Regions:
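Residue-level signature of mid-helix packing/kink "hotspots" within the transmembrane helices
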Residues: 30, 58-66, 117, 149-151
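Conserved MFS/SLC helix-loop-helix module at the cytosolic interface between two early adjacent transmembrane helices
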Residues: 63-101
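Interfacial helix-cap and linker-helix signal at transmembrane-aqueous boundaries
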Residues: 39-40, 71-72, 157-163
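Extracytoplasmic
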Residues: 13-45, 68
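Cytoplasmic helix-loop-helix junction between adjacent transmembrane helices
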Residues: 106-145
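Helix-loop-helix hairpin linking two adjacent transmembrane segments in secondary transporters
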Residues: 141-191
Length: 196
């Protein structure tokens, strides 16, 4: 296995697009965790409510993964990812403009799980372009997008301190929108319907 062979074996633009999609999706998925102290203070949440606030997106992600995976198999990973990002943008918009109670954040958190289900789309989208000897590397590169959790943890509290927690949801829409455009431009479904 050589890096030169890897570069020629698959579709590098789709691999980059899958990495970016996975990255902003994971950033969005965990956004309530870094914002939980701000929401706790503003909404007067108990420790149990704060725990639910961070756990519900994980539940949503678990429940949405098989759905997005089946949808990707049916209509293709590219279209599924684009639909997922549109729904994620809508969820962030609702968090920015309308979510103001614990119950609304529980619902919001559940739908942020759509972003957490992204790896059921991103990994096959990238790996199906590569022969078996390179699929592990392709999935590893696309899977590095889980670094988005780090971006949320580093930047969300600072943004909330400076602009407020509600504006942080609006600001989070910006990288998702940029990746949406890049993804639409770069990503292509493999002509192979299933991985070897």
């Amino acid at each position: 296995m050589s890096m030169r062979g890897f570069a020629r074996a698959g579709h590098l633009p789709t691999l980059i697009a899958a990495l970016l999609y996975f990255d902003v999706s994971f950033m969005t998925w965990v956004l309530l965790g870094p914002l939980a102290p701000f929401l706790r203070d503003e909404l007067g949440l108990s420790p149990t409510q704060q725990g639910l606030l961070t756990a519900i997106p994980l539940l949503g992600g678990s429940l949405f993964r098989p759905v997005l995976g089946m949808l990707a198999d049916r209509i293709g990973g590219r279209r599924t990812a684009l639909i997922g990002m549109v729904l994620t943008l809508a969820t962030l918009f609702l968090g920015w403009q309308y979510a103001r109670s614990a119950a609304s954040f529980y619902v919001l958190g559940f739908f942020l799980g759509l972003a957490g289900a992204s790896f059921a789309v991103a990994l096959p989208l990238a790996s199906r372009w590569y022969p078996a000897e390179y699929q592990g590397l392709a999935m590893g590169i696309a899977g590095a997008g889980n670094s988005g959790t780090l971006m949320a943890t580093l930047f969300a509290p600072r943004l909330a301190e400076r602009f407020g927690w509600a504006a942080t949801f609006g600001i989070a829409m910006l990288p998702v929108a940029v990746v949406f455009v890049l993804f639409a431009w770069l990503a292509r479904d493999s002509p192979k319907r299933t991985a070897p």
